């Protein structure tokens, strides 16, 4: 059994967990999430604890048990605290703003780029060069951040582009004569 799967997921007060076969649904103060668990994983709920164990005779069940436990833990954290991802725009004239349910980006193209936000993700721009994405689903928040970053990833010479707030961009030295 994987080390991750051995640790149980504690369910805090105010969080409602429902197990329906292999479907796990978690409701909390910030929202609700539903996820289907791999068939090779056995999920049990005892008091305020979720336990995950691999089923016998299924290949890869050990790894799937650890994955299911990590996903369930992220669901609990998401509905209680939520997830946040910060992006920075580095470059002359690079700006971001919120237009309805979309993020409008001026990234040096001939036209502004508008990225529509999916349901469950909200965005705000504290400054013209910062974007803060928030939501309950860790995977969805990270995917939206990656999609926005992909419009203009940081280039290796000056570091201009869209980057994560904690990202260290490795710059190359310019060509010498």
Swiss-Prot record:
Q: Which GO terms describe its cellular component?
A: cytosolic large ribosomal subunit
Q: Which InterPro entries match?
A: Ribosomal_uL6-like, Ribosomal_uL6-like_a/b-dom_sf, Ribosomal_uL6_a/b-dom, Ribosomal_uL6_bac-type, Ribosomal_uL6_CS
Q: Which UniProt keywords apply?
A: Ribonucleoprotein, Ribosomal protein, RNA-binding, rRNA-binding
Output the superkingdom of the source species.
Bacteria
MF terms per GO, please?
A: rRNA binding; structural constituent of ribosome
- GO BP terms in the entry: cytoplasmic translation
Q: Name one Pfam family in it.
A: Ribosomal_L6
State if Ribonucleoprotein is listed as a keyword: yes
Protein purpose = This protein binds to the 23S rRNA, and is important in its secondary structure. It is located near the subunit interface in the base of the L7/L12 stalk, and near the tRNA binding site of the peptidyltransferase center.
Assembly information from the UniProt record:
Part of the 50S ribosomal subunit.
Query: Which protein family is it in?
Result: Belongs to the universal ribosomal protein uL6 family.
This chain belongs to the protein called Large ribosomal subunit protein uL6
Q: What is the lineage of its organism?
A: Bacteria, Pseudomonadati, Pseudomonadota, Gammaproteobacteria, Aeromonadales
Name of the coding gene: rplF
């Amino acid at each position: 059994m994987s080390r991750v799967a051995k640790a149980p997921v504690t369910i805090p007060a105010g969080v409602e967990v429902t197990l329906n076969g292999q479907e796990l649904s978690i409701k909390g103060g910030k929202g609700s999430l539903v996820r289907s668990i791999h068939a090779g994983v056995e999920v049990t709920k005892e008091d305020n604890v979720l336990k995950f164990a691999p089923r016998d005779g299924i290949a890869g069940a050990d790894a799937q048990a650890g994955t299911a436990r990590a996903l369930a833990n992220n669901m609990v954290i998401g509905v209680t605290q939520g997830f946040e991802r910060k992006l920075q725009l580095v470059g002359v004239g690079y700006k971001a703003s919120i237009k309805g349910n979309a993020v409008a980006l001026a990234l040096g193209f001939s036209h502004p780029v508008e990225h529509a936000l999916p349901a469950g993700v909200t965005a705000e721009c504290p400054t013209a060069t910062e974007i803060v994405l928030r939501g309950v689903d860790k995977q969805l928040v990270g995917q939206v951040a990656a999609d926005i970053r992909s419009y203009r990833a940081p280039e290796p010479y000056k570091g201009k582009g869209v980057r994560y707030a904690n990202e260290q961009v490795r710059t190359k030295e310019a060509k010498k004569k």
